[in-house]
Amino acid sequence: MPSADSVFDYVVVGAGPAGCLLANRLSADPSCRVLLLEAGGRDNYPWIHIPVGYLYCIGNPRTDWCFKTEAQPGLGGRALGYPRGKVLGGCSSINGMIYMRGQAADYDRWAEQGNDGWAWKDVLPLFKASESHFAGASEHHGGDGEWRVERQRYSWPILDAFRDAAEQSGIDKVDDFNTGDNQGCGYFQVNQRSGVRWNASKAFLRPIKDRPNLTVLTGVQVDQVLLNNTRARAVKAFWQGAWHEFAARREIILCAGAVGSPCILQRSGIGPRQLLESLGIGVRHDMPGVGGNLQDHLQLRLIYQIRNSRTLNQMANSLWGKMGMGLRYLYDRSGPLAMAPSQLGAFVRSSPEQATANLQYHVQPLSLERFGEPLHTFPAFTASVCNLRPASRGRIDIRSSDMNSTPLIDPNYLSDSQDLRVAADAIRLTRRIVQAPALAAFDPKEYLPGPALQTEEELFEAAGKIGTTIFHPVGTCRMGNGELDVVDNQLRVHGIPGLRVADASIMPQITSGNTCSPTLMIAEKAAQLILKGAATQTYLNEDAIPTP
């Protein structure tokens, strides 16, 4: 157990997907001492591991930070819950388990903006390095990594029919969304092993738990990064009822996510001068971009009541249904309890001028009024659709120097008129798919937002009423070389030697799909960059060692 004056080669803050992978890679060198700090607890809560248990993890302080956004004018003044994992594995312990890389064009765009080494050709090997694909190694997939990818273990007639309806609407069927072009409709591949959630803790920490040079601490809340002049030397953290300094001889790497990483930087005096001075925080490095550029995927949840088919709604509202689901899962880890929240997906262009798919569907054999409430008692499915490349930008900032104060989260949803137009197009496209012959036998009736809403203005208003986060915040420590960029293409914080950020916050633009696996790729890249630098670096941060 480390003491207050412990010194490590690397201190990694945050044991989410990025932190778990990074700690694994850095500690592979037995001569390097690595410390991984996590604010949450161990991932021993049973509902983490049962796939449908995400319903009991989101909004649960045992596993979730339980953040909330500011009231959103674009959503009719509503404030949203903003789930972020607070447990070993981070969001990979509470998310939808979908394995999704995005599009080749996403990463090529990053590289075109001056981020050399981040094009699709550069990052594809990084995705493959950590992947254990059910079909084995191939041109597009890895077979020997730790991050397990499997087919789903349960199907529903209503989802098969939706896929047929999408095909009748001009959306081709596909079997693999992860080849660089995800256009089409198909079933998501998921991060599970034999019907059990496969989170980053299982993948990257458990196999190496006996490495003597790796220390993993839970229940550690990091307040700030401590500097010697401008160089990062240690983190100040609260652990086991006392304040500690954990020092790094080489580097500190923030993997605290799109909410946590900018907040730690700001409390460290690294951020917008005006904000820091208003909170009485000494400015160590004026960086106006810290906390800006917030992007998220806003999902529009269209619900359709159906006939002639069973959905999870009926099963979850029946004692016998619940018993049957439980017994089936106990028997062979299959059935509804083994299913990801969203099983069927589609990637579509909202209009012909889009170069690649800019809409993503998550189609679910269930419905509910809002997250945290019981499933409806009537049979229904939800066609959730989100704009993959929103133009709206928001911010995340601290409210005070106290690390226990909740951050100010303002995604600024639907503030850009372009996003409103895409939302209206998405609702119209969904209605067209649902009216296709393949779904006629189920007699779908629109429950939300309601068929009476037809004009452009009505659809704008409807989007604000049914829109909610799909939990993909990114971009708040943006990578690049501009005045508002926080890290360079090596993930080094501009102007602060010895400090990097390696998580979803560095994305210049959000990827076109779910963001967990791209975050793992970022950590894989960070590990390569750090180890390459360490091989040629003779300077060690001796100033990191606290003075007695």
Q: Model-found features: residue ranges?
A:
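N-terminal glycine-rich phosphate/pyrophosphate-binding loop and immediately adjacent elements
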Residues: P2-K128, M287, H297-I306
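Glycine-rich loop(s) and the adjacent beta-strand/alpha-helix scaffold that form part
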Residues: S31-R33, G41-D43, V225, A234-G324, ...
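FAD-dependent oxidoreductase catalytic-site/capping-region signature
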Residues: P2-F8, L124, S130-T179, G186-F188, ...
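Short loop/edge segments at beta-strand edges and connector loops
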Residues: T218-V220, H285-M287, N481
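Residue-level detector of alpha-helix initiation sites
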Residues: V12, G16-L21, R153, A258-V259, ...
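Conserved redox-cofactor binding core of oxidoreductases
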Residues: A111-A232, F238, R301-M323
